Amino acid sequence: MEKGTFQIKTGFAEMFKGGVIMDVTTPEQAVIAEEAGAVAVMALERVPADIRAQGGVARMSDPKIIKEIMAAVSIPVMAKVRIGHFVEAMILEAIGVDFIDESEVLTPADEEHHIDKWKFKVPFVCGARNLGEALRRIAEGAAMIRTKGEAGTGNVVEAVRHARTMWKEIRYVQSLREDELMAYAKEIGAPFELVKWVHDHGRLPVVNFAAGGIATPADAALMMHLGMDGVFVGSGIFKSGDPRKRARAIVRAVAHYNDPEVLAEVSEDLGEPMVGINLDQLKEEERLAKRGW
């Protein structure tokens, strides 16, 4: 991507619509993801379930691991940086990743400021729990939004909450008179121009994917029914009993989310799903979705 204009960045993200992006930690996993039909992979040293289990500070992955994954597949490769850590983003841009995820899954580097994403040619995806968060990230230059969900839990409830909240707030914006939009923009802390765009178009100005806790084909199809453009699957595939089969099943579930017969077929005989976490058991400081603002 020679030109880093916003239209080119958002156009690139549009190409992922209707697809599945999978977390991978090795070139072998990346090949499994590509063969299963993933539209892109997210290169990581540890999947969110392991980051959650091991604790400590989670940082950008070793560039060597990311480069090995990039060499193994022909589909786009994404990688994560800490919230606010623009130097990690500079490193990823230098090694040629296709997309950067400024991610709450990693330990935030800055608790007040997100990265100024306009300064980069490479496009960014960011998490959001509601319309205000989404529009702030887009104002900073994000070319793609995803729900935050609660990564590494295998529990889809937070992703569902964030998706429903986003659409509820979009519908509310549409119900406002034009002379009420400025006050609402102030209330949610988002630029007026973006609030007006949402009012006029009834959706976000960029692609919006589901992420965080998606573990089964049914979970993935549920998020598509809730109006998402596609799905990120993290720990749910390679922490399960039969990753190859589950990866293929989730890709088919997203493509055929409206066909219960296909969903029933792809949900059969997938082996053990990842062990999930009931969110009631999480301490407040263990919740990743509240990172960022």
From Swiss-Prot:
Catalytic reaction list: aldehydo-D-ribose 5-phosphate + D-glyceraldehyde 3-phosphate + L-glutamine = pyridoxal 5'-phosphate + L-glutamate + phosphate + 3 H2O + H(+)
Q: What class of enzyme is it?
A: lyase
**Keyword Lyase annotated:** yes
Enzyme Commission code: 4.3.3.6
Q: Which GO terms describe its biological process?
A: amino acid metabolic process; pyridoxal phosphate biosynthetic process; pyridoxine biosynthetic process
Its pathway is: Cofactor biosynthesis; pyridoxal 5'-phosphate biosynthesis
Catalytic residues at K80 (schiff-base intermediate with d-ribose 5-phosphate)
The entry marks the following residues as binding D-ribose 5-phosphate, namely: D23, G152, G213, G234, S235
Q: Which UniProt keywords apply?
A: Lyase, Pyridoxal phosphate, Schiff base
UniProt cross-references to SUPFAM superfamilies, sorted A to Z: Ribulose-phoshate binding barrel
* Positions bound to D-glyceraldehyde 3-phosphate: R164
Question: What GO molecular function annotation could you give as one example from this UniProt entry?
Answer: pyridoxal 5'-phosphate synthase (glutamine hydrolysing) activity
Recorded hits in PANTHER family, A to Z, give: PYRIDOXAL 5'-PHOSPHATE SYNTHASE SUBUNIT SNZ1-RELATED
The job of this chain, per UniProt, is described as:
Catalyzes the formation of pyridoxal 5'-phosphate from ribose 5-phosphate (RBP), glyceraldehyde 3-phosphate (G3P) and ammonia. The ammonia is provided by the PdxT subunit. Can also use ribulose 5-phosphate and dihydroxyacetone phosphate as substrates, resulting from enzyme-catalyzed isomerization of RBP and G3P, respectively.
Q: How does it assemble?
A: In the presence of PdxT, forms a dodecamer of heterodimers.
Family membership: Belongs to the PdxS/SNZ family.
- Protein name, please? Pyridoxal 5'-phosphate synthase subunit PdxS
Q: Which organism is it from?
A: Thermus thermophilus (strain ATCC 27634 / DSM 579 / HB8)
